[in-house]
Amino acid sequence: MAYPFQLGLQDATSPIMEELMNFHDHTLMIVFLISSLVLYIISLMLTTKLTHTSTMDAQEVETIWTILPAAILILIALPSLRILYMMDEINNPALTVKTMGHQWYWSYEYTDYEDLCFDSYMIPTNDLKPGELRLLEVDNRVVLPMELPIRMLISSEDVLHSWAVPSLGLKTDAIPGRLNQATVSSNRPGLFYGQCSEICGSNHSFMPIVLEMVPLKYFENWSASMI
């Protein structure tokens, strides 16, 4: 999860988030190299008193700086498209959970089970126990099995919302009348926090998301106790 004065991304917990972090580093390296080269050329031209006759009109140079940026953009676009297809692909999900956004809480329905559904509200600050996180704790966590592909069906009952869990690389819009889907998969157990990422009204900041990723056996015991 995030911590105060954090400069980097949250620790990756899913394969998608690992790919996104690698792509971020890949793109940042390209941007750094281009920026360094441009700044070096600008400083060189500003500090030297010599002027090359072909600096202002050189067909070869213009050809190079047309082809080179195109090649760089392709190097950025190809891994980006690959990740987009990975995020959209859902093959044989082990579990399907329907998520509905409301003003200002989330409701969840485990479609593979009968009568396994609940609402998830933020716990007010005055009701927090020692060690719990302000504005992030909920009364009902979403318990899911780890190391399995899980399909989330996301929509909204009223206005636009966005279901986002940064450490899992998830951010999917909840749109009234439309059903979006996302894949959830965690490499390790733990609690993973998120929030609504679309301004949805006065209490937009008060609809957190808490995923509890657990081993399959623990999930089976939990689901049996909830039915």
UniProtKB/Swiss-Prot annotation:
GO terms for cellular component: mitochondrial inner membrane; respiratory chain complex IV. It catalyses: 4 Fe(II)-[cytochrome c] + O2 + 8 H(+)(in) = 4 Fe(III)-[cytochrome c] + 2 H2O + 4 H(+)(out). Belongs to the cytochrome c oxidase subunit 2 family. Residues 1-14, 88-227 are mitochondrial intermembrane. This is Cytochrome c oxidase subunit 2. It is a multi-pass membrane protein. It comes from Lemniscomys barbarus. Binds a dinuclear copper A center per subunit.
